[in-house]
Amino acid sequence: MPSDIEIARAATLKPIAQVAEKLGIPDEALHNYGKHIAKIDHDFIASLEGKPEGKLVLVTAISPTPAGEGKTTTTVGLGDALNRIGKRAVMCLREPSLGPCFGMKGGAAGGGKAQVVPMEQINLHFTGDFHAITSAHSLAAALIDNHIYWANELNIDVRRIHWRRVVDMNDRALRAINQSLGGVANGFPREDGFDITVASEVMAVFCLAKNLADLEERLGRIVIAETRDRKPVTLADVKATGAMTVLLKDALQPNLVQTLEGNPALIHGGPFANIAHGCNSVIATRTGLRLADYTVTEAGFGADLGAEKFIDIKCRQTGLKPSSVVIVATIRALKMHGGVNKKDLQAENLDALEKGFANLERHVNNVRSFGLPVVVGVNHFFQDTDAEHARLKELCRDRLQVEAITCKHWAEGGAGAEALAQAVVKLAEGEQKPLTFAYETETKITDKIKAIATKLYGAADIQIESKAATKLAGFEKDGYGKLPVCMAKTQYSFSTDPTLMGAPSGHLVSVRDVRLSAGAGFVVVICGEIMTMPGLPKVPAADTIRLDANGQIDGLF
């Protein structure tokens, strides 16, 4: 089997206007970025308001492992399969961040014969959306320090500035810095730090905004500092929102690309699910729903993170509701959750598979607790044995009364996921229950955190450090107590310990810090050792990425 990059380069791509025709998007509504990428015009999107919406399919996964699960690959394969069985389907994905591309993960455009293309452009600069978000965030940072430099009329307390800087890169050296050094002309020295762009509240606002007006209003609500008498200061107070909206105007238009089979995909926005809310933009999702029978979208990492936030944050704010949910699992990842070392995964091990099944079992039960119908998509790898697949299907049937379907979209494209597509349609067109949430917004923030920890993570309780407790009390006092919560924790475990695999129970969820995201409309809860600025691994992917003798990129996949 050729590599992902070889498969992508061998593909014959359709002109983007032909892809747009499948969704009924006219040429005049496209802003082309070359032959195979386009943005969809704001005015055309506004014209869709009030149109009936198709069915929404959410793709999530078990707790990820270094073995890889293939959630994006499954999302693409499922979208292609739905088109193959006669449904007009579009995929809605997040844009990749440069940090993971050059760090540990590599590219994020699917794999094998289930990819979105042109994948090199998608994985790198794409249409410049992340640059626009980084620039808007940086403009706000500059305006804050400029306001303080010129007399500080708002009486901002330089010890209580919450607005950190961002860059779309994994760079641990920037987590904590000193700024404005070098003399009076450079401003007032203070401690500062950088987060990765995908953790920026601008990114969250970008992905939750309904339109440009909503974007600007949300930006204005962002709390960036406190005054000396402990009153909140917003971006509207420093008059940043108009210029920031100008920088984001074109970026807010969704990006249209295609799969290897020529089917449409909207790729827009990219918050991580372990340190942000992990969903693509509301604008892209709504656009897909108004243009297609089925919109297939993914939520980052496992269902305890991305799917929970998709429901408790994105669906709560927008009224969206998935008609069916696919939980992606792999034989090898379940064996890792059952205690097998990565180097031993190729050997058949039914005992470890059954032990690791506890992870999938909890994710399925968690998704069902929201009132959503579930099917398990088993992403097939060539090392898997027939006995392992048979045992997993048996476990799903007997212990969960849920169907598990082996999918071979990586090797076969949409044809390898037709059975999954049929199951998704059956669930989506079947009986639907009301959507329920993990908590009610009327409860205190601490109660919301505890509800997620105990109901979804299997924890005995939460443990809030004193700094976080003080900040939470302040949020309640300032009127932010009814906001939902966005849990920032390791993606590798239901606990805050990334080495605790499977389905641990009875642990404590440690809350180290909290951050207010008033514009996005949630409180970020930082648990355990999770960082909002990742670092590079000992051997980063960047070590092997280069241009070959023909000027083509090598090593991105």
Swiss-Prot record:
Q: What is its EC number?
A: 6.3.4.3
Reaction(s) catalysed (UniProt annotation): (6S)-5,6,7,8-tetrahydrofolate + formate + ATP = (6R)-10-formyltetrahydrofolate + ADP + phosphate
Q: Which SUPFAM superfamilies match?
A: P-loop containing nucleoside triphosphate hydrolases
Q: Which Gene Ontology terms describe the biological processes this protein takes part in?
A: tetrahydrofolate interconversion
Query: Which InterPro entries would you find in this protein's record?
Result: Formate_THF_ligase, Formate_THF_ligase_CS, P-loop_NTPase
Give the binding site residues for ATP.
T65, P66, A67, G68, E69, G70, K71, T72
Checking Gene3D superfamilies in the record gives: Domain 2, N(10)-formyltetrahydrofolate synthetase, Formyltetrahydrofolate synthetase, domain 3, P-loop containing nucleotide triphosphate hydrolases
Keyword presence, DNA damage? no
Q: In which pathway does it act?
A: One-carbon metabolism; tetrahydrofolate interconversion
Q: Which GO terms describe its molecular function?
A: ATP binding; formate-tetrahydrofolate ligase activity
Check the record and name the Pfam families matching this protein. FTHFS (PF01268)
The entry assigns this protein to a family as follows: Belongs to the formate--tetrahydrofolate ligase family.
Which gene name belongs to this protein?
Answer: fhs
Name the chain's protein. Formate--tetrahydrofolate ligase
Q: Which HAMAP family match?
A: FTHFS
